Structures are given as C-alpha cells and as structure tokens.
Amino acid sequence: MEYRIERDTMGEVKVPADKFWGAQTQRSKENFKIGSEKMPMRVVKAFAILKRSTALANKRLGNLDAEKAEAIAAVCDDVLKGKYDDNFPLVVWQTGSGTQSNMNMNEVVANRATALLKEKNSDQTIHPNDDVNRSQSSNDTFPTAMHVAAVLAVYEQLVPALDQLRNTLDEKAKAYNDIVKIGRTHLQDATPLTLGQEISGWVHMLDRSKEMILEATDKMRALAIGGTAVGTGINAHPEFGELVSEEITKLTGQTFSSSPNKFHALTSHDEITYAHGALKALAADLMKIANDVRWLASGPRCGIGEIVIPENEPGSSIMPGKVNPTQSEALTMIAAQIMGNDATIGFAASQGNFELNVFKPVIIYNFLQSVQLLSDGMNSFHDKCAVGIEPNKETIQENLSNSLMLVTALNPHIGYENAAKIAKLAHKEGLTLKEAALKLELLTEEQFNEMVKPEDMVKPKA
C-alpha cells in the first residue's frame, strides 16, 4: 500500500494515499481498534448535510470565501451521493464528543475540495479546521448531526415501514370483521369478538405509536449548532445557528431550527432519549402483535390454530414437516433489542457532566440501530407474514362453540350466580352450556337459543 504524510498539531502521520482523510482520522483508526461497530452512515451523511450548510451560512455572513464555500458544498454533495463512503472508517468507540468523526468529515472534505480547486487552476487550499469547521466545534456539530440523522431516519425508514404494516392489518381487520371468534384474557377463554375487531386493536396500536413517535421526533428539530465549545457561541456569528438551520431545512425538506438554549443542547440528550422512548413503545406493541400472531397460528393440530400464516421455510432440523412462526420470532427479538437499546440510551444520556455529554456516539448508534431494526423488522413481518394471514374458520367455530364463556350472555337474564352454575356444571360433566342449563332447569331450550347468540355478543346492547 502506498502512503502519504499528513500533519496535525501532534506531528506527522502516514495515511493511505488513496484516501482523503487526514492525520486525526488516521490517529483515531490506530488508537481505537475496538469492535466492528462503525459510525452509522446516516451520521456521516448528516455531517455532510451540516458541513454543506455551515459553508453556505459562513459564505452568507461573509466569513468564508465564495470559491471555498462552493467547493466544500460540492464535495458534501458527493458524500451524500455515497461517492466517498469508504473514507469514513471510524468506529463508534471513540471520544464521547464524536470529535474524531467530525474531523474525519472535515479532513475528507478539505482534501477533496482542495483537489477540486486545483483542477480549476485555483491556488487556494481548504483547511479542515479553519474552513470546513469554521464557526464550529465538535461539541455542537456532533449533536446537530445526531438530531438531523435521527429525524431523517424516522421519516425515511420508520414511517413508511410502519404505514405499510398498519395498512395491511387494517385491510385484514375489515375483511374479517364478520368472523366471530372466542376472546381470551389471562390466556383463558373470554367473551366473543370478531377477528376483525381483534386485529383492529393492533391497527390502533400502530396508529398511536406513530403519533407518539412523530410528536417525539419534533423535539429533535432544535439544533445545537451555533453553541460551539460550551454553548456560549464563541467564534461564531450570533446568526450562525439560525442560518445553518435554514440551510439544513432547505436541503432536507425537514424543518429544523436553532436550539433556544445551546447549553442544554450540548450537555443534555433528553430529546433523543424521549424520542427513543416512543420507539420502545412501538417495540412493545410489535412484541404483542407478533406474540398474538404466533399464538393464534399455533398448532397445526394441538394449538389454537385460529389463523393460518405463510409457510416460509422448514422449521426443524430433526422434526420433518415442522413449520415455525419465524417472522414473529424475529420481530420479538428485535423488540427485545430495542428495549435494551433504550436502557443504554437512558444511562448514556444521564452522563452529561458540566457543559458536555460525552456519550454521544453510543446514543446515536443505538437510536439509529433501533430505527433500522424496527423498519426492517416491520417490512419483513409484513412481506413474509402479515399479508398472508388467513382465518381458519373451522377451528374458530369449533373453539367458539366449545367456550364456556358464552354463558356471560345469560347474566342479564338469570344473574351471575346462576350463570356460573351452568358454566361449572358444563365444565365438570363435559356438557354443552345448553345441556347444563336444561339439566339445572334454569332455562328452556328456546330461551337459551334466544339469549346465547355469539354474533350478538360482539357489540354493546341497550
């Protein structure tokens, strides 16, 4: 491999000749050989959005030469297109302020932008700190990139996946709204409802989760940029934060604003913690939905078996013909991971000391992982399971007919205690509810048939 020599305030460093990063990126690569968790590409792209916006804001304020600003913006555009993805090699496990990832972007942009200017016969050079990082600190850029990355991830990945699953389940709810089945509470038989009503509960969970996620995501639209080192804004123009936020808004199509209190923006990550709490709520709902699906599909002969789900792959290496609810299993594991991520984020967010929280990389890494897993998990569950959910009408009817809880319909007519006598006798002697009612001489057959109609038990009755 060929190398070139780069320099920083600590001296010379050998850097791969085919890469645009500089000395500080190389030092980070050598000093933090920890794990395989790279800084998420969404953070890299958010930094490109930010550096493009800061260059244009500095240009508007007269703090950066127009030629330099345009060269920086051009390189950032290429980064956003994925042209230099292999120039961002750093892991999450680095300085807690994210300084090395900030400098990684500064160095790549500066070196490539300088090369662009040379191609245009310009004698200007672009410095990673003085030009690309002008009016900025890692302490305000990294939290800004965190918020930009988080908001875009929610809207570009999570919301489409959530909407798709929600809409398909809504179609199922409407299609199966006339199929009366037995309800279950405490894992025991309960009064009837329709399969459509049961699924409609899942739909409403997803609707509420989306509402909570979007409301929480709005909290992350306030950006730290302009606070520089400790929140005072030293070395930045008073209007810098607002101008950068305007540029980011233009570029992304999402509304961002300058945080009203930069001291809070640097040292606290309560907003992203709050937003991840909404992701955890979605994970809890998905855990419940996936569990319901696999319980309802359990069997095929000795389980509940009231719905049929797609058979995607063999389920056992020893039991021939076995097929398992693998999409539900994958989704429940994802939900467990999101709950673990929430614990990590909550603890990390509590560790802001004085003017700066230095757990930033692990916070955004876990947040973006949660969005990725939830999005991919919902897409997979949708494509390989939800679209193929069908009712097993024969089993549904058999379970409904055998349920003792249909006796609840008799409460208004013969009272709770007499209804309980019927249920207990039926259970003890293996009778139907009708047979037990007749044996106890509490009702005639005609009265029982008129009072116990499962289809009339699925809605309120005056």
Curated annotation (Swiss-Prot):
SUPFAM superfamilies: L-aspartase-like. The record marks 329 as: Important for catalytic activity. Keywords: Cytoplasm, Lyase, Tricarboxylic acid cycle. Its main location: cytoplasm. One of its GO terms (molecular function) is fumarate hydratase activity. Pathway: Carbohydrate metabolism; tricarboxylic acid cycle; (S)-malate from fumarate: step 1/1. It catalyses: (S)-malate = fumarate + H2O. InterPro entries: Fum_hydII, Fumarase/histidase_N, Fumarase_C_C, Fumarate_lyase_CS, Fumarate_lyase_fam, Fumarate_lyase_N, L-Aspartase-like. It comes from the Bacteria. Substrate binds at residues 97-99, 127-130, 137-139, 185, 317, 322-324. Belongs to the class-II fumarase/aspartase family. Fumarase subfamily. HAMAP family: FumaraseC. This is Fumarate hydratase class II. It comes from Bacillus subtilis (strain 168).
